[in-house]
Amino acid sequence: MLKHIVMWNVRGDDDATRARNLALLKAEFESLRGRVPGLLHLEVGVDESGVDYACDVVLYTEFESREALVAYAEHPEHLRVKRALGDLRIARHQVDYDATGTPGRDPITRAGAAHPAGASVAGIHPHEGDIDHVQTL
């Protein structure tokens, strides 16, 4: 199982606009439940902490495999959500990780191979050819 977690801040010059944007984001992503093969679980949480360094919203998803996450990135329903949200989302952070504890796979070194200079371990910066850095949202 692969977990895909994305956090954002949303645009909005005032509290009412930000609240509308958060509600739209939550509704759009929740509309993906049951529509994407291999997407096992989806949650959208809006921050309640009120701390100034928190992100506004988190998307927590579980996929049956890495291949399912890759397919999700190009699935028509996911692409529809991306279009619907436009540039509403800012300050994006992402982490993808194997939750099965696959033996022999080191999540830091990607099975023992050294990361190229500047590579992102957390998956924040997409990296061509590296499945852990797939840009999905």
Write out the residue ranges for each language-model feature.
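Short S/T/G/P-rich N-terminal loop/turn motif that feeds into the first structured element of a domain
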Residues: 1-55, 64-70, 97-137
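C-terminal structural segments of small proteins and small subunits
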Residues: 66-87, 91-93
